[in-house]
């Protein structure tokens, strides 16, 4: 007879690293990691995902929507997740804006971080009777409205002195900006100022000197001094060439809190304000959103979770996502490998 000892075994290609014994050969493993491949971005399963701020606002940038460009007014859908598809938001196609002087480019991204966003139905200030008035509300051929007449941003009123009596230099004036949102939301109040060459400044405002502006809300105070002249003619989206520029900024007012704006000539007074609440998780990505995915990953796009861990590029991800690990993980589902048993000699 032949007597065999040991267990049935075969060659084992599986090696796992253990905490106590280092590398160990085992008879079977279950892979716990995957290495994703890049894919398009998708809607996050089980939640609303926002791409463009206003999907139905055609030929509009998100900054157009955020500022209330006349032909870019529409509903911003609620969303628990948002795609930051403009890493550096493009300009608005209305009046030429001096973007680099303020944080105006950040406004669309600020709005994107809220779950619910709506524009107020009425104005926060009566611009025509504001201090330093009476004013007429200025419009521009560079900002055509829906009937192709002259228009301007819905979030601001261009306060131009109404008659020669108040078309003069003025000491700084202050206007209070009340809180008008009705559901305890954050109020995002947009304001700004216009400046031009000396000739146009005298024609519009009766003063060609640099003007001073200050906003204050929620403990944040910002100061500006306008630049006079030195601007080349510039047209936006085929509008009329403009020698002037506007500077646009915003302030965030918490529930019930009043803000203030101190200004001289050329002020763009706040009008309709954004009322925003809830949080939307924001991730850098690209449009369009195609289909659905368990996870949105900045480097790989939409991922469906097939394993609990992944290797590859480590980046921000939202949703039901695998966990990043540096090296592949395996779960041993067999026994420690033993070499084939040797046969004992026949007796």
Swiss-Prot record:
Keywords: Disulfide bond, Fusion of virus membrane with host endosomal membrane, Fusion of virus membrane with host membrane, Glycoprotein, Hemagglutinin, Host cell membrane, Host membrane, Host-virus interaction, Lipoprotein, Membrane, Palmitate, Transmembrane, Viral attachment to host cell, Viral envelope protein, Viral penetration into host cytoplasm, Virion, Virus entry into host cell. Major glycoprotein, comprises over 80% of the envelope proteins present in virus particle. The extent of infection into host organism is determined by HA. Influenza viruses bud from the apical surface of polarized epithelial cells (e.g. bronchial epithelial cells) into lumen of lungs and are therefore usually pneumotropic. The reason is that HA is cleaved by tryptase clara which is restricted to lungs. However, HAs of H5 and H7 pantropic avian viruses subtypes can be cleaved by furin and subtilisin-type enzymes, allowing the virus to grow in other organs than lungs. The gene is HA. One of its GO terms (molecular function) is host cell surface receptor binding. It is found in: Virion membrane; Host apical cell membrane. SUPFAM superfamilies: Viral protein domain (SSF49818). Belongs to the influenza viruses hemagglutinin family. InterPro entries: Capsid_hemagglutn, Hemagglutn_HA1_a/b_dom_sf, Hemagglutn_influenz_A/B. Its main location: virion. It comes from the Viruses. Glycans are attached at residues 25, 59, 145, 166, 304, 333. The keyword Ubl conjugation does not apply. GO terms for cellular component: host cell plasma membrane; membrane; viral envelope; virion membrane. Binds to sialic acid-containing receptors on the cell surface, bringing about the attachment of the virus particle to the cell. Plays a major role in the determination of host range restriction and virulence. Class I viral fusion protein. Responsible for penetration of the virus into the cell cytoplasm by mediating the fusion of the membrane of the endocytosed virus particle with the endosomal membrane. Low pH in endosomes induce an irreversible conformational change in HA2, releasing the fusion hydrophobic peptide. Several trimers are required to form a competent fusion pore. It comes from Influenza B virus (strain B/Finland/56/1988). GO terms for biological process: fusion of virus membrane with host endosome membrane; fusion of virus membrane with host plasma membrane; symbiont entry into host cell; virion attachment to host cell. It is a single-pass type I membrane protein. Homotrimer of disulfide-linked HA1-HA2. The keyword Lyase does not apply. This is Hemagglutinin. In natural infection, inactive HA is matured into HA1 and HA2 outside the cell by one or more trypsin-like, arginine-specific endoprotease secreted by the bronchial epithelial cells. One identified protease that may be involved in this process is secreted in lungs by club cells.
């Amino acid at each position: 007879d032949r007597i065999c000892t040991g267990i049935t075994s075969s060659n084992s290609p599986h090696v796992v690293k253990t905490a106590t014994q280092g590398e160990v050969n085992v008879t079977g493993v279950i892979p716990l990691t995957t290495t994703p491949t890049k894919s398009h971005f998708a809607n996050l399963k089980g939640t609303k995902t926002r791409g463009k701020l206003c999907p139905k606002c055609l030929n509009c940038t998100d900054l157009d929507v955020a500022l209330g460009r006349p032909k870019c007014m529409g509903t911003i859908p609620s969303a628990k997740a948002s795609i930051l598809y403009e890493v550096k938001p493009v300009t608005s196609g209305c009046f030429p804006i001096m973007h680099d002087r303020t944080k105006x480019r950040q406004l669309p991204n600020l709005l994107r971080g809220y779950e619910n966003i709506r524009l107020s139905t009425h104005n926060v200030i009566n611009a025509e009777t504001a201090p330093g008035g009476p004013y007429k509300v200025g419009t521009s051929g560079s900002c055509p409205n829906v009937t192709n007449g002259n228009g301007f941003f819905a979030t601001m009123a261009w306060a131009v002195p109404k008659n020669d009596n108040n078309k003069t230099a003025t000491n700084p004036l202050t206007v209070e900006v009340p809180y008008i949102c009705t559901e305890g939301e954050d109020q995002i109040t947009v304001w700004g100022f216009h400046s031009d060459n000396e000739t146009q400044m005298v024609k519009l405002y009766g003063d060609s000197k640099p003007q001073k502006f200050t906003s204050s809300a929620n403990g944040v105070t910002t100061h500006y001094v306008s630049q006079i002249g030195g601007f080349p003619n510039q047209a936006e989206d085929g509008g009329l060439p403009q020698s002037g520029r506007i500077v646009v900024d915003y302030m965030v007012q918490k529930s019930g809190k009043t803000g203030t704006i101190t200004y001289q000539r050329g002020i763009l007074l706040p009008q309709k304000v954004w009322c925003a609440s809830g949080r939307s998780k924001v991730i850098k990505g690209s449009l369009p959103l195609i289909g659905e995915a368990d996870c949105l990953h900045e480097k790989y796009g939409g991922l469906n979770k097939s394993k609990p861990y992944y290797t590859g590029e480590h980046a921000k991800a939202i949703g039901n996502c695998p966990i990043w690990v540096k090296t592949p993980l395996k779960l041993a589902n067999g026994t420690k490998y033993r070499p084939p048993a040797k046969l004992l000699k026949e007796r």
